[in-house]
């Protein structure tokens, strides 16, 4: 089998994770931590790309990686327009939306830009894979009870789809042939209904839908939320922080560290026990609702993400949902590996690269 060497880039706010893979085998994985003062000199996140590019190249050189031997570069997908899942070639339309922050400004926007900047000098392809804006929701799933307020698909697409593919392989099937309920449990929690390779419904784990999580409030009583917003006690930014960052376990028990909460549960703390059970309860309830989306025809329920290492949480969830389908636990996440696998599928011609196309304010994915 021929060897494809892939450079993978996953930019964070103050770090850049990089990996070099020979097919599925990691040759190098490193987290480059950037000096906060250095990156603080740039007015916009997007202006950091040249600095980060040079840093990446220096690190590769220091490890003896010859970039001329690369077959492709793959970056983490950023805040683009809604697109279907898959591996996309980085093109001019995508670069423009990433640089302009079409759907927001985030360090992940640098992923496609860095991949393109390095790949173009080597005359090799640059890709992104399954960004958070993946949107495969069916029309019926988009409707909310308020006109003009449509439900949005924002979730852990990269890890959900990567783990779904692993589970399909484990079950000796193709991802595109199965119905799966995949739950990513990390700082945010998302439950996706995967129907034959498409996530036809999923809770918006970013800003207020679904189970509460270590840092996010999830679905809350809307009437009380409105009253709080107009109480005169809070600014807009404070309310947003209550939903994202200071919600969930942070609000209820004062920490986003699930390990600490587990230790409290093991010591018999009644408040911690109730709150941890409530989080598991809400996850199970979301899984139950998602099972109806797939008409109860479920091949497996999958639990993944950092919280899937928690036996207490996993057992609580299993107890409530294992009557629906077998529960398969794939703890943790490996974004570098998932990105490399997405690029590899294209290089091996197992799937065609998709093209990011903007037409009349709409994005169309072409395979």
Swiss-Prot record:
Keywords: ATP-binding, Cytoplasm, Kinase, Nucleotide-binding, Transferase
Main location: cytoplasm
Catalytic reaction(s) noted: butanoate + ATP = butanoyl phosphate + ADP
GO molecular function annotation: acetate kinase activity; ATP binding; butyrate kinase activity
Annotated protein name in UniProt: Probable butyrate kinase
One annotated Gene Ontology cellular component of this protein: cytoplasm
TM region(s), chain numbering: none
Subcellular location: Cytoplasm
Family: Belongs to the acetokinase family.
PROSITE patterns xrefs: ACETATE_KINASE_1, ACETATE_KINASE_2
Record-linked HAMAP family: Butyrate_kinase
Gene source species: Bacillus cereus (strain ATCC 14579 / DSM 31 / CCUG 7414 / JCM 2152 / NBRC 15305 / NCIMB 9373 / NCTC 2599 / NRRL B-3711)
